[in-house]
Swiss-Prot record:
Residues 1-24 are annotated as: Disordered. May be a general defense protein. One of its GO terms (cellular component) is membrane. SMART domains: AAA (SM00382). ATP 2 binds at residues 836-843. This is ABC transporter G family member 52. Residues 484-697, 1116-1330 form the ABC transmembrane type-2 domain. The gene is ABCG52. Residues 135-406, 791-1043 form the ABC transporter domain. PANTHER family: ABC TRANSPORTER G FAMILY MEMBER 39-LIKE, PLEIOTROPIC DRUG RESISTANCE PROTEIN 1-LIKE ISOFORM X1. Belongs to the ABC transporter superfamily. ABCG family. PDR (TC 3.A.1.205) subfamily.
């Protein structure tokens, strides 16, 4: 046996020696190549036998590419080893890596804004600001705004090779400091900031540094890999290619053989088409995102990655930059302490080894994470309280009289020691000697401390610019060539089109259906060419086809607006210039225009009976295709100009209206007033319709004479509409349309280049964190009566249909299981922590228990105090603080809480008690000073993330629930705010309530404030359910008893230790299955017995029930919803103010264009013009109301889903509130329009006629508005709503009776005429104004007789039209309510 072993060993060693010899020979051959070729050539071990192959990394075959990516993926498995090897390689040849030292001196930052009540965006304030702007422009008054100081005269140095932790309470100026240091601040900054002695003007800071925002702004439809890969393609490799070339040159000179693993990685990451993919895979691996790399990012309405993964994605997207300085803002929100430690440690390894510079702001760093940092910057009230080595920070605070207690995290101590409320507990002396030490005094003391003196001394000596490495600071504006940036944007645009392919397919099918509808209405068997009047029918068909193309493009505005936040972020960070974004969004959409035009023209042209000449067929196609491009470009320009969904949805219909009025169909060129004739000549629709008309009516089929007229019939038809009748005008019109395509796309690009988001409004009280006053209410419990309840659950399984991405990877199971046999109990008076690594299923379990899942498959039993859970009852006695803080943006903190309390507290609670209770809860979570602060939109305006989190908790607490689920209540909070929240939660539990919290990164103090722990591992399995114990003794005892688990270190955070020792990596290393160990433990059996005990109803008890489905009566629900909607509308100027401005402009436009036409009776064309005015106003203002209400509905609908899940109100009461609040605004809009138009157009001034006009316009605007609301309720998103709405706008347009009167509509479609609301509007408007007019036209026919004979309108049936328009308004409002009740498009 020994001989055999020796022979085998010798054989293996001989084989190994041969492989080494072969590798040496290949390396020797490689070394002989020129440096340029060697940079592109590497030795790659090919699977499965590891055969070495010489490959060109720039031109890889598919199999080589896969092998390369597999090989370099292994590099990320040990990031520190890789970095050390790389550093060793560059050190061997004497290459010095670039470093950056950042200095800031006498730095001041301030903002300018309206504050207090003037800061609230009410309609009145908006009009006041507009008037002030006008008076300021005329130098009559001065701008009344306040300067809000953020940072005061701060100075410091951030050195390379060192990790700097930025601490400070919210509102202290952390984000402003990071933005200023990164060179991306939009506020007023004074003082000096230098990189290696160079001012910001001497280099490109956006490419020399990377700012990682605390807000996760991504395109929801892209996957994680695609998001990071796009960033990598745009950022490029920086100086790394030059480094590689120099490295290879020196190694060749010194005859040094590089490490093969490092060599192939560097070459793959800096050259070839796969370089972005290599960097992307590496970053995803080290940040733990490789497990969700092919999952879409998602958003509130589209299921995607978790909040913690989204936060890591934000980090990944930015650290692909080759910049040497990192400024990272709250990157740990939503991450567990173990994951945070790993990420920060990975960054630390990079910074330490490669000489980078990093400033990272963290909210609740665990002690072990805190110790990874070298330096500390502590901000408070806009001043630097400490800036220096971590080792001296406790020494400094001890010198001013404060000491950090044992088992207290130093980071938590630092954030609390400057707070007026928390400072006293850290005072070294006796309570009698304590006096509050203001932040200014501490900051002054730091200047005298030896660390502060050393910084001042160093700042006094300028940095020697000669020491600056040439590659340290970027001087080129963009990372790669314009060609590469354009390719990256084109590829991304194609991806987005694929992900939204359903939308485009749906739109094409819809267009096909409308085309079938149109061609069967204008069918050739009913279309004649024997009179000018019949020629008008053909003109109407051309006009309708043109407007169909125009309206179909409206749906593009929603998706375009949704992408703007990502564009502005990436543009400002110099990912790419705006034109590389705008050009693909134009070019890639050309096939969509081609498809839409093809569907329309190919279906309708010959069926309607246009000129059969095939050349004229393709000419019509060309006009409509180019017009489609014009309208898409116009709407993109509007989106970029307004940058707001509501304003854009108003501007779109407004532009359509102007161009439609001036196109020559509704009002002929001869009838256009001389002061508006310029509008006729600049209207793109005029050129489109003129080209269509010339193409059709100059055809051979129209070249015939009719009795009583001279010249061909086609020219007579053109002349009757005042169109330009020469053939040349077809090509002139095509040229004009192409010019508009270019113009609007250029304007779109200019807007994207120079415009930014509107400045947010700052509330004075919300701005100051330390405005929160000390309150003794922090120790109070809630006083309202409630029923203590427990919840048990057994063998819970939750699964979803297997995603396509998993199937593509070979997963054959039909369902993906996210929770596996989960059992437990949550009891009254017991505070339970639900913990686990990111992706363990914590939020999923809470969603299942709370009944919030809208998809998937749930198995198992859930009982409430022994009785089976009934969701209707459970929603009444439970509260759920969701991870995403979803609130109505246009109400204040106090109003949000009052609304929740009003609808969720029992009807027996009177208003005074309810108000007192709300104030008590505000004091409990310390948001009383913020009661008048506007909530706002996350990341845009209003409350900061930590205040929003406290509001989320308060909204549930005011419901006085018996059971409360809290999903990451301390996520996004600093240590002090987290302590406030935990005190409030602890007080809540002490009143006898059942509270469960998922929690990340708890400090020792917060973790040990919980009574029990429910611990889950990745894969949705429980591994510990039981008591934590005093100083976590029970938890530690359980895990230390497991073989292979390392003992906890003294002073180590038990929660962090627990997550580390139970991680998947540790399970694999120790071969331990913690889930199986738990299920075989005595603790598991004890829990099973407890579940069994609690699952049986107590003797003499009864199942909880309520006499009504909701806490409040229907009328109260409606009043509460109406009250909140009133506040939301009053504070939504983009919606209301723009609507009224639009109405005024439209009224003046109509009044001046149709001036005095209501008094004329000369001929029938005059009546057609009057009806055209009515038709245009009805369609334009109606579509504007319908399209502008939809974004407002979608913003509130997400909040509605949360509130409905809590059983606050019925869908019908909410819908009625939404409908009712529109009536006063629509009525005022109607008054404005009717008074102006009625007077200027010259309708007959009688009370009855004016009231009829008012009546029909009011209900027309009402049913259009309610139709828009109904469509928002029936569709999953704004884009789909716009697409579906557009179809009905066009159908209503067709059957309105204007393009083709009822008597000319084919009999098989005439039934729909009676179902068209616009037809009844035109009937009512025309009949009420002219149905009793007996004046005669030039041909002797009276006005009333012509109306009855041509249109079929009868004066004595006016009341039918009135009933019809009222009925449509009621119908659409009812369907809106029904849609909210029946459909839930939120995917959870």
């Amino acid at each position: 046996m020994d001989d055999a072993g020796e022979i085998c060993s010798f054989s293996r060693s001989s084989s190994s020696a041969r492989e080494d010899d072969e590798e040496d020979q290949r390396w020797a051959a490689l070394e002989k190549l020129p440096t340029y070729d060697r940079a592109r050539t590497a030795l790659l071990a090919m699977p499965p036998d590891g055969e070495l192959r010489e490959v060109n990394v720039q031109r890889l075959a598919a199999v080589e590419r896969r092998a390369l990516l597999q090989r370099v993926a292994g590099v990320a498995d040990d990031h520190a080893r890789f970095l050390a090897k790389f550093k060793e390689r560059v050190d061997r040849v004497g290459i010095k890596l670039p470093t950056v030292e950042v200095r800031y001196e006498n730095l001041n930052i301030e903002a300018e804004s309206y504050v207090g009540r003037r800061g609230l965006p009410t309609i009145l304030n908006t009009y006041t600001i507009i008037m002030e702007g006008l008076t300021n422009a005329l130098c009559i008054t001065k701008k009344i705004t306040h300067k809000i100081p953020i940072l005061h005269n701060v100075s410091g140095i951030i050195k390379p090779h060192r990790m700097t932790l930025l601490l400070g309470p919210p509102g202290s100026g952390k984000t402003s400091l990071l933005l200023a240091l990164a060179g991306t601040s939009t506020l007023k900054v004074s003082g000096t900031i230098t990189y290696n002695g160079h001012s910001m003007e001497e280099f490109v800071p956006q490419r020399s540094a990377a700012y990682v925002s605390q807000h996760d702004v991504h395109m929801a439809e892209l996957t994680v890999r695609e998001t990071v890969n796009f960033a990598a393609k745009c950022q490029g490799v920086g100086h790394h290619y030059d480094l590689l070339m120099e490295l290879l040159r020196r190694e060749k000179e010194q005859n040094i053989k590089p490490d093969p693993e490092i060599d192939i990685y560097l070459k793959a990451a800096t050259t070839g088409e796969q370089k972005a993919e290599v960097v992307t895979n590496h970053i995803l691996k080290i940040l733990g995102l490789d497990i969700c790399a092919d999952t879409i990012v998602g958003n509130n309405m589209l299921r995607g990655i978790s909040g913690g993964q989204k936060k890591r994605l934000t980090t990944a997207e930015m650290i692909v930059t080759p910049g040497r300085a990192l400024f990272m803002d709250e990157i740990s929100t939503g991450l567990d302490s173990s994951t945070t430690f790993q990420i920060v440690n990975t960054i630390r390894q990079t910074i330490r080894i490669l000489g980078g510079t990093a400033v990272i702001a963290l909210l609740q760093p665990a002690p072990e994470t805190y110790e990874l940092f070298d330096d500390i910057i502590l901000l408070s009230d806009g001043q630097v309280v400490y800036n220096g080595p971590r080792d001296h920070v406790l020494e400094f605070f001890k010198s001013v009289g404060f000491k950090c207690p044992e088992r207290k995290c130093v980071a938590d101590f630092l954030q609390e020691v400057t707070s007026r409320k928390d400072q006293k507990q850290y005072w070294i002396g006796s309570d009698d000697t304590y006096q509050y030490v203001p932040v200014t005094m501490i900051a002054e003391a730091f200047q005298s401390f030896h660390v502060g003196q050393a910084i001042r001394s160093e700042l006094a000596i300028p940095f020697e610019k000669s020491k600056n490495h040439p590659a340290a600071l970027a001087t080129s504006k963009y990372g790669v060539s314009m060609k590469e940036l354009l390719k990256a944007n084109i590829y991304r645009e194609i991806l987005l089109m694929k992900r939204n392919s359903f939308l485009y397919i749906f739109k094409a099918i819809q267009l096909k259906l409308v085309a079938i509808n149109a061609m069967t209405v204008f069918i050739r068997t009913n279309m004649y060419r024997d009179s000018i009047e019949n020629g008008r029918s053909y003109m109407g068909a051309l006009f309708y086809g043109m407007m169909m193309i125009v309206y179909s493009a409206l749906a593009e505005m929603g998706p375009a607006i949704a992408k703007l936040p990502v564009l502005f972020k990436q543009r400002d960070l110099l990912y790419y210039p705006s034109w590389t974004y705008s050009l693909p969004s134009w070019i890639i959409k050309i096939p969509i225009s081609f498809l839409n035009t093809t569907v329309w023209v190919f279906l309708t042209y010959y069926v309607i009976g246009f000129d059969p000449n095939v050349l004229r067929f393709f000419r019509q196609f060309l006009v409509l295709f180019v017009l489609c491009e014009v309208i898409y470009a116009l709407f993109r320009f509007i989106v970029a100009l307004t940058r707001h969904p509501v304003i854009a949805s108003n501007m779109g219909p407004f532009c359509i209206l102007i161009f439609m009025l001036s196109c020559g169909f509704i009002l002929t060129r001869d009838d256009v007033k001389k002061w508006w004739i310029w509008l006729y000549w600049i209207s793109p629709l005029m050129y489109a319709l003129n080209a269509l008309a010339v193409n059709e009516f100059l055809g051979q089929i129209w070249n015939k004479s009719i009795l009583g007229y001279k010249g061909p019939l086609g020219r007579l038809v053109l002349g009757s509409s005042s169109f330009l009748p020469e053939t040349k005008w077809y090509w002139i019109s095509i040229g004009a349309l192409l010019g508009y395509v270019l113009l609007f796309n250029v304007l779109y690009t200019i807007c994207l280049t120079f415009l930014t988001h509107a400045k947010e409004i700052i509330n004075d009280e919300a701005n100051s964190y330390h405005a929160t006053r000390h309150s003794s209410a922090g120790n109070k419990g809630m006083v309202l009566p409630f029923v203590p309840l427990s919840i048990t659950f057994e063998d819970i399984r939750y699964s979803v249909d297997t995603p396509e991405a998993f199937k593509a990877k070979g997963m054959t199971e039909g369902r993906l299981e996210l929770l596996k046999d989960i059992s437990g109990s949550f009891r009254q008076g017991v505070l339970t922590a639900l913990m686990g690594v990111s992706g363990a299923g914590k939020t999923t379990l809470l969603d299942v228990l709370a009944g919030r899942k809208t998809s998937g498959y749930v198995q198992g039993s859930i009982t409430i105090s022994g009785y089976p859970k009934k969701q209707e009852t459970f929603a009444r006695i439970s509260g759920y603080c969701e991870q995403n803080d979803i609130h109505s943006p246009n109400v204040t903190v106090y109003e949000s809480l009052m609304f929740s309390a009003w609808l969720r507290l029992p009807v027996e609670i009177d208003s005074a008690t309810r108000k007192m209770f709300v104030y008590e809860v505000m004091e409990l979570v310390e948001i009383l000073s913020l009661k008048d602060a506007l909530v706002g939109l996350p990341g845009v305006s209003g409350l900061s993330s930590e205040r929003r989190k406290r509001l989320t908790i308060a909204v549930e607490l005011v419901a006085n629930p018996s059971i409360i689920f809290m999903d990451e209540p301390t996520s996004g909070l600093d240590a002090r705010a987290a302590a406030i929240v935990m005190r409030a939660i602890r007080n809540t539990v002490d009143t006898g309530r059942t509270v469960v919290c998922t929690i990340h990164q708890p400090s020792i103090e917060i973790f040990e404030s919980f009574d029990e722990l429910f611990l889950m591992k990745q894969g949705g399995e429980e591994i510990y359910v039981g008591p934590i114990g005093r100083q976590s003794c029970e938890l530690i005892k359980y895990f230390e008893a497991i073989q292979g688990v390392s003992k906890i270190k003294d002073g180590y955070n038990p929660s962090t230790w627990m997550l580390e020792v139970t991680s998947t990596t540790q399970e694999q290393r120790t071969c331990v299955d913690f889930s199986q160990i738990y299920k075989n433990s005595e603790l598991y059996r004890r829990n099973k017995n407890l579940i069994k005990e609690l699952s049986a109803p107590p003797e003499g008890s009864s199942d909880l029930s309520f006499p009504t489905q909701y806490s409040q009566l229907f009328l109260t629900q409606w009043l509460a919803c109406l009250w909140k909607q009133h506040l939301s509308y009053w504070r939504n100027p983009p919606y209301i103010v723009v609507r009224y401005l639009f109405t005024i402009v439209v009224a003046l436009l109509f009044g001046t264009m149709f001036w005095g036409i209501g008094k004329k009776r000369q001929n029938q064309q005059t009546l057609f013009s009057i009806m055209g005015a009515m038709y245009s106003a009805c369609m334009a203002m109606g579509v504007q109301n319908s399209s502008s209400v939809q974004p407002a509905i979608f913003v509130e609908r997400t909040i509605f889903y949360r509130e409905r899940a809590s059983h606050m109100y019925s869908a019908l009461s909410y819908a009625l509130g939404q409908v009712a609040i529109e009536f006063p605004y629509i009525f005022l809009q109607t008054i404005i329009y009717c008074v102006l138009v009625y007077a200027m157009v010259g309708y007959e001034w009688t009370c009855a006629k004016f009231l009829w006009y008012l009546f029909f316009m009011f209900f027309t605007l009402s049913y259009f508005t309610f139709y828009g609301m109904m469509m928002a309720g029936l569709t999953p998103n704004n884009a789909m709503s716009a697409v579906v709405s557009t179809a009905f706008y066009n159908i209503w347009n067709l059957f309105s009776g204007f393009l083709i009167p009822r008597i000319r509509i084919p009999v098989w479609w005439r039934w729909y005429y009676w179902m068209c609301p616009v037809a009844w509007t035109l009937n009512g408007l025309l009949t009420s104004q002219f149905g009793d007019v007996n004046d005669k036209f030039n041909n002797g026919v009276s006005v009333s007789d012509f109306i009855e004979s041509y249109f079929g309108y009868k004066q004595d049936l006016l009341w039918v039209a009135a009933v019809a328009v009222v009925s449509f308004a009621i119908l659409f409002a009812f369907l809106f309510g029904l849609s909210l009740r029946l459909f839930n498009f939120q995917k959870r």
